[in-house]
């Protein structure tokens, strides 16, 4: 691929915050299409290292001179307004030089131009469902381009420039940026109040999904989960506008006709087997999954319909879904030590927490008499304030809970809001741990043979999984001198 296949403004770019999940994916695609890319980020990361290996010139720290990393200068600067302040010295310098500054969603829309696009949005399950569509199409030999918010287990990457005619991407609803896109197939997994710090009201948040659906390309289709009240209502409103709607959901749950029905579902270890019925077919089909949880089976149904809609054969799609190994930080096994399994999960909304813990509970139940221990880090003060009681209720699915302090991300602290706000609503044994550095030792000391530990949240709680495994290993070494701890 050559830079001539990119729009002129994307042939030589500088990316502020290049190491982030969304930005690093854009950088990968630009590099794969022959573009020249420089960038900056606050710290080193796996994403930064991978992009350097592909040829990106990256500086740690933010300084106006970073715009000169590429010999000959840049044609544009790319950033994401959710995380990068306008006072950033590189953005200030770009403005002084008259260099256009583009936001990530607009750049992604430009990269999609000319391809059949499948976009997945919703309050929960976006990344997993998007990844399922990608894996299914790859299995069918379609080699789609893609950009997703997590790292695919199979591909080991969050973005790819494919040779096929398709582009599959996650549409982030958190800041309204999904309105930059014009998809051919739009999948909406669910709609539930979130990101009220940006939208101000539930009505405004729900409204952005209606606006997104109205941007469907002519002849496009909306795929929605009819089990979810929010997306089911969106389906009704969209159908009234003449938009073609394909619904999926559970048998006996939805009021409207379903294009794909989850007839039954059975947990098997860390996977599942489901019976599904497709509209127009006489007999049900079997759908095998390698990831646990009924919510995953519903996500797979949405991915199946999206893949079928762009011409993929049903049987091949189901085979592809059977091999889907999950997404990094979505119930990802970190390691096992002393018969304790440690997982990491990105859940950061009460509904996500509840769905994940229900799935984990079924895994624990099948494996014996072990307990479920959850290390939960609330994400954002505004979300913690809005959903403290709901988080507490969701965490009650565990046997023991360790609540950390709030991961602030882009927000300033709110008076009276902390991890304790969540902990006080948990009714099972709970500990509020303010000292992040001590968490691994405390959790390892509490875990026993057969237990499952899940670190959960969208912040740096993900760093604790390896530390807990290491602490368990150290405990084994201390208890039996000369015997190495088990680490897988």
UniProtKB/Swiss-Prot annotation:
ATP binds at residues 122-128. It is found in: Cytoplasm. One of its GO terms (biological process) is cell wall organization. The keyword Ligase applies. It catalyses: UDP-N-acetyl-alpha-D-muramate + L-alanine + ATP = UDP-N-acetyl-alpha-D-muramoyl-L-alanine + ADP + phosphate + H(+). One of its GO terms (molecular function) is UDP-N-acetylmuramate-L-alanine ligase activity. Keywords: ATP-binding, Cell cycle, Cell division, Cell shape, Cell wall biogenesis/degradation, Cytoplasm, Ligase, Nucleotide-binding, Peptidoglycan synthesis. Pathway: Cell wall biogenesis; peptidoglycan biosynthesis. Gene3D superfamilies: Mur ligase, C-terminal domain, Mur-like, catalytic domain, NAD(P)-binding Rossmann-like Domain. It comes from the Bacteria. Pfam families: Mur_ligase (PF01225), Mur_ligase_C (PF02875), Mur_ligase_M (PF08245). GO terms for cellular component: cytoplasm. It is an enzyme of class 6 (ligase). Its main location: cytoplasm. Its EC number is 6.3.2.8. Belongs to the MurCDEF family. Cell wall formation. HAMAP family: MurC. PANTHER family: UDP-N-ACETYLMURAMATE--L-ALANINE LIGASE, UDP-N-ACETYLMURAMATE--L-ALANINE LIGASE-RELATED. This is UDP-N-acetylmuramate--L-alanine ligase. It comes from Mycobacterium marinum (strain ATCC BAA-535 / M).
């Amino acid at each position: 691929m050559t830079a001539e296949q990119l729009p002129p403004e994307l042939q030589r770019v500088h990316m502020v915050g290049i190491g982030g999940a969304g930005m690093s994916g854009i950088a990968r695609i630009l590099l794969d299409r022959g573009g020249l890319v420089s960038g900056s980020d606050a710290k080193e990361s796996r994403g930064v290292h991978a992009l350097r290996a592909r040829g990106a010139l990256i500086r740690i720290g933010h300084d106006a001179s970073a715009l000169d990393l590429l010999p000959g200068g840049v044609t544009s600067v790319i950033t994401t307004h959710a995380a990068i302040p306008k006072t950033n010295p590189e953005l200030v310098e770009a403005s002084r030089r008259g260099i256009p500054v583009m936001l990530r969603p607009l750049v992604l829309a430009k990269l999609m131009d000319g391809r059949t696009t499948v976009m997945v949005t919703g309050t929960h399950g976006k990344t997993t469902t998007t990844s399922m569509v990608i894996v299914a199409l790859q299995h069918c030999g379609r080699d789609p381009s893609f950009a997703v918010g997590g790292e695919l287990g199979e591909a080991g990457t969050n973005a790819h420039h494919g040779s096929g005619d398709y582009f599959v991407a996650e549409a982030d609803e958190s800041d309204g940026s999904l309105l930059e896109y014009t998809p051919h197939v739009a999948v909406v997994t669910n709609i539930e109040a979130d990101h009220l710090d940006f939208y101000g009201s539930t009505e405004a948040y729900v409204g952005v999904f209606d606006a997104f659906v109205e941007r469907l390309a002519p002849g496009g289709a909306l795929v929605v989960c009819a089990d979810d009240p929010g997306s089911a209502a969106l389906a009704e409103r969209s159908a009234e506008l003449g938009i073609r709607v394909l619904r999926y959901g559970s048998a006996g749950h939805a009021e409207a006709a379903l294009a794909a029905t989850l007839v039954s579902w059975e947990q098997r270890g860390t996977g599942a087997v489901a019976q599904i019925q497709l509209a127009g077919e006489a007999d049900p089909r079997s759908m095998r999954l390698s990831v646990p949880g009924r919510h995953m089976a519903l996500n797979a149904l949405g991915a199946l319909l999206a893949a079928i809609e762009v011409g993929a054969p049903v049987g091949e799609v189901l085979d592809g879904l059977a091999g889907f190994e999950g997404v990094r930080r979505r119930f990802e096994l970190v390691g096992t030590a002393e018969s304790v399994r440690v997982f990491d999960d990105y859940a950061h909304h009460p509904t996500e927490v509840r769905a994940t813990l229900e799935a984990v509970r079924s895994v624990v139940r099948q494996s014996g008499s072990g307990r479920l221990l959850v290390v939960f880090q609330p994400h954002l003060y505004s979300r913690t304030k809005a959903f403290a009681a709901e988080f507490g209720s969701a965490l009650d699915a565990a046997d023991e809970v360790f609540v950390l302090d709030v991961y602030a991300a882009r927000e300033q602290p709110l008076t009276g809001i902390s991890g304790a706000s969540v902990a006080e609503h948990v009714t099972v044994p709970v500990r509020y741990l303010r000292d992040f550095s001590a968490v691994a030792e405390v959790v390892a000391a509490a875990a026993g043979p057969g237990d499952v530990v899940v670190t959960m949240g969208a912040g740096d709680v993900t760093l604790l999984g390896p530390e807990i495994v290491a602490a368990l290993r150290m405990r084994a070494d201390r208890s039996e001198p000369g015997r190495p701890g088990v680490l897988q």
